[in-house]
Every structure is written in C-alpha cells, then in structure tokens.
Amino acid sequence: MAITIQEINELRKKTQAGLMDCKKALTEANGDMEAAMEILRKKGQLVAAKRSDRDAAEGCVLAKVDGNYGAMIALKCETDFVAKNADFVALATKIIDAVVAAKCKSMDEVNALTIDGENIKDAITNRSGVTGEKMELDGFNFVEGEDIVAYNHMNQNFLCALVVLNKKGFEEAGKGVAMQVAAMSPIALDADSVPQDVKDSETRNAVDKAKQNQIGKAVENALKKAGINPAHVDSEDHIESNTAKGWITPEEAAKAREIKATVAKEAEANLKEQMIENIAKGMVAKFYKENCLLEQAYIDDNKISVAQYLKSIDKDLTVTDFKRFTLRAE
C-alpha cells in the first residue's frame, strides 16, 4: 500500500525518528501506525545494544529544585553534536522534571518513572535508536533541606550544582555559593566532613613530601657548597646530557653523584620528627582550605572564606549540604 507524507510526518512527530526510517517502518507495517512505532522501538533497542560498549562522554547535566527537595541527573551520549540537539536536551529536561515531581531518592526509583507514557529506560533507548549513539542515564543525586539553590552553568548543560542552606530567604547568597561549588569542586563541607581515608592519605603524602623537601634542601646546599649548579645534576639524565654538552666536567658529575647519595642518606637519618610533623600539618591545612567548601576562599572576594561570606550576611547562615555534576575532565 502507498504511504502518505502525512502518515510519515505523524510517525516522525511521535517518535522523532528520521523520515526514511519512518517510511520504511510504515511500509513494513502496511500503514499500521502502532505497528510502525513498535518496529522503530525495536530498531532503537538493537542500535543501543550494538553501541553498548562505546564511551558516552558527552551529554547533559541538569539540576532542579522543588521546595525542600533538589535533584540532578546526567544523561550521557557520545558526541557534543547530539548533546546540543534540542530533542536530546528536551529528553533530559523531561527526566529531571519527572525526578523532582516524584522526589526520587535512588536510581532505582528514577528508572521506575515514566515520561510521555513510556519507561525512562525505553525513552532513552528509543532516542538512542534515532541518533545512532549510545545513551545512558549515568548519574543521579538529590538533596533535602531548609532552602535549596540550583545552579546550571550558563545553560550549557555540562556543569551543575545544588547547595542547601540552613535558613530560608537567602537565595542570592545561595546562588553565589552554588557557583562556588561549580567552579571550585570542593570535596567536603569542612575538615570534619572529609572522609577519614582521605585524611589519612593526605597526611601520609604530606609527611613524605615534607621529608623529601628537607632532604632535597640539604643536597642542594651541599652541591652549591661544592660549586655545582643543582639544576645541572637534578637527575641522572641531566648529569649525562650536561656532561656531554660540557656544562659540567666528568669529575663534577662524579662528585655530584657522591654528594646526592651520601648527603641524602645523612639528611634522612637526621630528620627532626617534630619539624616534619609541623610542616605536614601545614600542608594538610592548606589541602583543607583548598578543598573544603566553607574553608575555600570565596570566588567573589578571595580575602574571605565562604563561611565568612555567609556570616557577613547572617551570623547563623551556613551550608548544610551540596552536590555537583560535571561532564568535563578535571
């Protein structure tokens, strides 16, 4: 039977599939609209299955708030071209709208939702069939609290944040802190909120670095005292190449090797434990200042911390939780 352009357009409007795909589906279904939709749905599942091992690194992340609940989702695809497609963004928007309306608290609850009469997973699979790209709902998070502010970075859909304040009526301050979260990627609210394994790891690294710095200074001073430029002998490759260039003599190269070995050993044996501990504490404190939200320098006034900024507005104002999604490598 002949398939009309009106039928093709109707199927395309319902499925967002390409014109030729719609025509082929209607022809195969002998003009039956429901059967054609089922054919396209199965085709979408086949396309999605074939692309399941591909890397979906682009996409759309969105955050939204409704009262005392806020959520964010990450819908992934393969290319920036598809990520910016209006239909793809519309699908992500429908998903976040449904998530917030249902106030989901787990990915299982999200996957159980329906949009436009179909399961979210099926909606994503069908869209994958239309675009020919792998798609997946790769992230979900939520917060609850007294007052929540969402930030979607310049409506570009690759970065978003949620911030929970302990008091209502400070949306502008919340927006500023949400931008802080998006820009500075804190790992915790404050030092007390940093996971213990992270604290232990940072402390170990700081102690090791403090020891190496002190040993390095001792070796550098000994080299300078011997009339050797430390930069010329900071590695075995440099010693060999700089000897070949004539920048240091073979005798200086041998002397440098001897100094580096003996002085480093002596310096390590004579390290002062209390001094190393104090230096390490300073390094860890710097880590907290750079990575804990309330201790970070506020992006709009780096002379004060985020905590100080909030207290300058209201003495009791603080952040109780935050979340962040980004599609960019950091």
Predicted regions and their residues:
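N-terminal assembly/interaction segments in proteins that build large macromolecular machines
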Residues: 2-330
